[in-house]
Amino acid sequence: MTIFLVGYMGSGKSTLGKKLAYNLKHDFIDLDSYIQEQEGRTIKEIFEDDGEDYFRKLERVYLHRIIDTENVVVSTGGGTPCHFDNMEQMNEYGLTVYINMHPKALIPRLQLSEEFRPLIAGMEGEVLLDYVYKTLREREGFYHKAHKVVTGYNLSAKKLHEFCLED
């Protein structure tokens, strides 16, 4: 089984994905980390050097390289489902799970990792909250195309595992 975790940055896709993969005895791929390994530079550097449009094209290329891998849990970038036909492709090749979180719950998580997230670099307080509300509203239509939607509040890998196996 291939499972694609989608959702806003900071929703727990990577943290839960690693644990879920372990529980399922699957491999784990963090798409952003995979891109960084393949490109030899950070996401932040790619954004700074080449811009978001270039990054989204790279993201699509690398997603398609791994999309038909079996027995893997893939943590996607927050914007991955929103570009090209990425969401449709993930839906075709595996189980997609949207980890849904309210913007106010995302803020503390994002503030802890802001330096690694180029889209929110330098944002704080109301500016960050407004940005999260706005972009989450824009992305939710894509996220809700997932096969399953689960709330990320107090979500454990065990609960996510059980949820993925439910019909």
Predicted regions: what is each one?
Residues L5:
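Hydrophobic anchor at the beta1->P-loop junction of P-loop NTPases
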Residues Y8:
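P-loop (Walker A) phosphate-binding loop of NTP-binding proteins
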Residues S14:
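Walker A/P-loop
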Residues S33-T80, F84-N91, F116:
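ATP-dependent small-molecule kinase phosphotransfer cores
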Residues S11:
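ATP-binding Walker
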Residues Y93-E138:
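A glycine- and Lys/Arg-enriched "phosphate-lid" helix/loop adjacent to the NTP-binding pocket
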Residues N23, R137-D167:
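NTP-dependent small-molecule kinase module
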